[in-house]
Amino acid sequence: TGEAATWMPGLECLLWVDIDNGILYQYTPDEGTVKEHTFPEMITSVIPWKGHGDEVLLAMKNRFIAYDLEKKTYKTLIEFPCLHPQWRTNDCKASPEGRIWCGVMHCSEHNGNGSLYCVDNDLSLTPVLGQQSIPNGIVWNRKGDRMYYVDSGRRCIEEYAYDYLTGAIYFIRTAVQVPVEYGVPDGMTIDANGLLWVAHWGGFGVYVWSPSTGQLVDKNRSSGS
């Protein structure tokens, strides 16, 4: 499956992953090439790593690694020692000030078994939210004082006040509750106007939501699910 599409500004390439088959794809438009980087375990997310040359951060099943796209070497940065074998990482994002936020879910997608973790700059790992379903897309507004977070199992996008000094979050409200007929909200990004662009699994498109009103603004259809 194609997940975690991430543009790498310094490297001028697009990365995405096949989670279950452990493949990282690298598309370089200037060369017109697609390279495959294969791993013996699942990969769930890609995070740009500013100032580290050809290295990117990859979320694996139960750890984060720093991977060099050119040398094809990696080193483990942090492990999740608390994870049950039936749990795995899911969508992960870096906040504007550099913390890594990581969703953890049950491999069978059982509701209520998911969690949201924060990895601080000193690589300390802190559980932030429990009893989640399928933690997914995470974004921040331009000011950096609001975090929006998708729980796919509950088909909602929640809004949190965000303290960039401490990394603390405070629940404000459910910004968007996605109707069943629109499918399941999955990965998410935010544009310059503060609108949320959300890929909907089973909804055949990317949906644009206003977090301030909770209303659907636009929909971009696709032929896939």
Map each language-model feature to its residues.
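Beta-propeller domains
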Residues: 9-39, 61-66
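Short loop/turn segments immediately following beta-strands, especially the blade-tip
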Residues: 160-168, 211-213
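A short beta-strand motif characteristic of beta-propeller blades
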Residues: 32-38, 75-82, 123-130, 171-178, ...
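Flexible "stalk/tail and boundary" regions
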Residues: 54, 69, 117-123, 142, ...
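Beta-rich, blade/repeat-based domains predominating
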Residues: 1-11, 40-56, 82-99, 128-147, ...
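A short loop-to-beta-strand structural motif that recurs across blades of beta-propeller domains
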Residues: 23-25, 63-65, 114-117, 156-158, ...
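Hydrophobic alpha-helical segments and helix pairs
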Residues: 72-128
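Conserved beta-strand positions in repeat-built beta-propeller and related beta-rich domains
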Residues: 8-9, 14-20, 56-62, 100-110, ...
